[in-house]
Amino acid sequence: MKVIFAGTPDFAAAALKAVAAAGFEIPLVLTQPDRPKGRGMQLTAPPVKQAALELGLRVAQPEKLRNNAEALQMLKEVEADVMVVAAYGLILPQEVLDTPKHGCLNIHASLLPRWRGAAPIQRAIEAGDAETGVCIMQMDIGLDTGDVVSEHRYAIQPTDTANEVHDALMEIGAAAVVADLQQLQSKGRLNAVKQPEEGVTYAQKLSKEEARIDWSESAAVIERKIRAFNPVPAAWVEYQGKPMKIRRAEVVAQQGAAGEVLSCSADGLVVACGENALKITELQPAGGRRMNIAAFAAGRHIEAGTKL
């Protein structure tokens, strides 16, 4: 069975490797163009391209697929049975969706129809969801509205960051899409069910500004945001005129004026919130490395009563 693969980041690279390891023929891999990255802004290949080249696969990097006759012709010439799409980042027009014999399967990191859109992992943590998961979806022209082929649940742990949930769902998604491809190969079809009309939510793209901590919110809400926005865009506060990223924190039952430092020690930097307080245990000063609060407090002293 011939499988086109389309994806860009690590989440997708894991799936590509799994599909290849399962023995499926992959005549073409689509990924986004190389982009400048890092402090030196060096042109860097996306993880999917790196994985594809290691596997000896053909790679194409079109800037767009919509109104791109050359890319469409390339897809048609492959005569693929199915396309697997994972965090590709480009819109697939209807003519692309229709090109493979069995259409396009998408690996989506939520329990659809909850958290359709760009940032499902982060929004699930931010909202305090007890669980999330992966859906393998038969793609249609809508935004994550296609029929669901399979659903795989994951319990969000109380200390899980977006990075940790990402890594867990990355492995779940890779195994899930291989299982569904094997079913398609053996039976010649997939049993997909329509998404419920109720329970639809949208996972809007993250912004740096929304990651700025508002101390008037409850400590529980802020703590979830810290985990949801870790590693990027990273929850932050202004400290000495510069942004300081907050990496880990926990809720404590203390009270004070919102944004007021209640104590600073090797155990934690405690800041009052709209309800309860937050004990910060790991942070990252502007231009510096991540550090635990003991290392931070050793070189700085923040007086109780200071406003953040």
UniProtKB/Swiss-Prot annotation:
Pfam families named in the record: Formyl_trans_C (PF02911), Formyl_trans_N (PF00551)
Gene3D superfamilies xref list: 3.40.50.12230
Annotated TM spans: none
Residues binding (6S)-5,6,7,8-tetrahydrofolate: S110, L111, L112, P113
Enzyme class: transferase
Molecular-function GO terms, alphabetical: methionyl-tRNA formyltransferase activity
Keyword set, alphabetical order: Protein biosynthesis, Transferase
EC numbers, comma separated: 2.1.2.9
Family per record: Belongs to the Fmt family.
Stated role: Attaches a formyl group to the free amino group of methionyl-tRNA(fMet). The formyl group appears to play a dual role in the initiator identity of N-formylmethionyl-tRNA by promoting its recognition by IF2 and preventing the misappropriation of this tRNA by the elongation apparatus.
Protein name stated in the entry: Methionyl-tRNA formyltransferase
Protein source organism: Neisseria meningitidis serogroup C / serotype 2a (strain ATCC 700532 / DSM 15464 / FAM18)
Gene: fmt
